[in-house]
Amino acid sequence: HKQSLTGQQIHKMLVDQGFDISYCTIINKIREKNKKAKECFIKQSYNYGERLEYDFGEVKLLINGSLGTYHMAVISSPAGDFRWAYLYRNQKKEAFLDSHVKFFEMVGGVYKEVTYDNMKNVVTKFIGKNQKELNEDFLKLSIYYGFNINVTNCFSGNEKGHVEGSVKIIRSYVFANKYEFPSLEHAQIYLHSQLLKLNENSKMDEEK
């Protein structure tokens, strides 16, 4: 069987080999390694119609001869493996709210929960370590449509991993080879047509 060395034994071995290192440093390193080893991400599974994930992603497009950075509001369903996006000139509140309205109108219904990171459009300010004050206009939107808001922990992208992966998939699938359009409207139409192809094998019909 594998032998386990104690902190004292490791410290003695290193000192004997000529390393100038304190016992406390050894202990701290062992604790740090053990903590990392315990961290694991469990893949979540959801029922149809239960959860959406939301994120913004940037894409560079040549519109009417001018190169610029545009913003994709990306909404995805982990259960249905469905991905959708809308192009905007910015990530302001108007674009954020508009993307929800467009998506719910398109699918003809509302999911029980939508998950977000701590973006400004969602979280107005932090109160203490765990409390968050949500944007008032966004709260009104969620009440109107009747969905629950789930905000991830800070720096925990894995909590909405499906949409983060969807941003990359849509960007590469749709705009890797074609990024020049006469207008943003034309880019939007092209995005829509490519998303229909991308979602051919999704389970969106089962979710409705």
Where are these regions (language model features)?
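Short, charged amphipathic recognition helices of the HTH superfamily
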Residues: 2-14
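Mobile-element integrase/transposase regions
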Residues: 12-24, 28-83, 91-98, 143
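Active-site beta-loop-alpha junctions of metal-dependent nucleic acid enzymes
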Residues: 85-110, 134
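Acidic/histidine-rich, metal-coordinating catalytic segments
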Residues: 110-130
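RNase H-like two-metal-ion nuclease catalytic core shared by retroviral integrases
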Residues: 116-117, 128-129, 149-171
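RNase H-like polynucleotidyl transferase catalytic core
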Residues: 137-139, 143-160, 179-181
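Active-site-proximal acidic segments at structured loop/helix or strand boundaries
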Residues: 167-208
